[in-house]
C-alpha cells in the first residue's frame, strides 16, 4: 500500500539482487549491509538502486570515509543515517556529531548507544 510510509532496508543480500527487485517496489529502498566502502556506495548510486542509506561509521572505515559518503549523498540529494552496529560513548558522540553536519531534510537519524 503506497499510502503507508515504509522503507525497505537492505531487502536482499547483494546489490545485484536488489537491482532485480527494485523496479517492482513502490516504496523506497535503503542500503545498509552492502555498502561497506565508498566504492560500494558509488556503485549503488550509479545503478540507481538506493533511495537512501543506513551508514555505519565503523563499517565504512571511520569518520573520514563517512564524511566522503555523506558528501556523495549531498551531491545526489540522498537521505541517510549516521549509525553504527554497537559501541560506547565515543562512537555515539561520533555519530551524533557527524549527523549534525548533514542537511536536516536528508538526515534519517543518528545512533546513540544504550545499554540493554
Predicted segment positions?
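Alpha/beta enzyme core
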Residues: 1-7
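Non-cysteine beta-strand/loop elements that form the S-adenosyl-L-methionine
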Residues: 10
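Shared catalytic-loop signature of beta/alpha-barrel
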Residues: 13-30, 36-116
Amino acid at each position: 500500500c503506497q499510502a503507508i510510509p515504509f522503507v525497505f532496508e537492505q531487502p536482499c543480500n547483494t546489490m545485484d539482487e536488489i537491482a532485480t527487485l527494485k523496479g517492482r517496489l513502490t516504496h523506497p529502498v535503503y542500503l545498509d549491509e552492502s555498502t561497506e566502502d565508498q566504492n560500494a556506495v558509488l556503485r549503488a548510486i550509479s545503478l540507481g538502486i538506493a533511495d537512501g542509506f543506513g551508514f555505519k561509521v565503523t563499517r565504512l572505515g571511520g569518520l573520514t570515509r563517512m564524511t566522503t559518503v555523506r558528501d556523495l549523498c549531498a551531491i545526489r540529494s540522498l537521505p541517510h543515517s549516521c549509525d553504527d552496529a554497537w559501541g560506547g560513548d565515543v562512537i555515539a558522540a561520533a555519530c551524533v556529531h557527524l549527523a549534525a553536519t548533514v542537511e536536516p531534510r536528508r538526515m534519517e537519524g543518528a545512533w546513540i548507544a544504550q545499554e540493554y
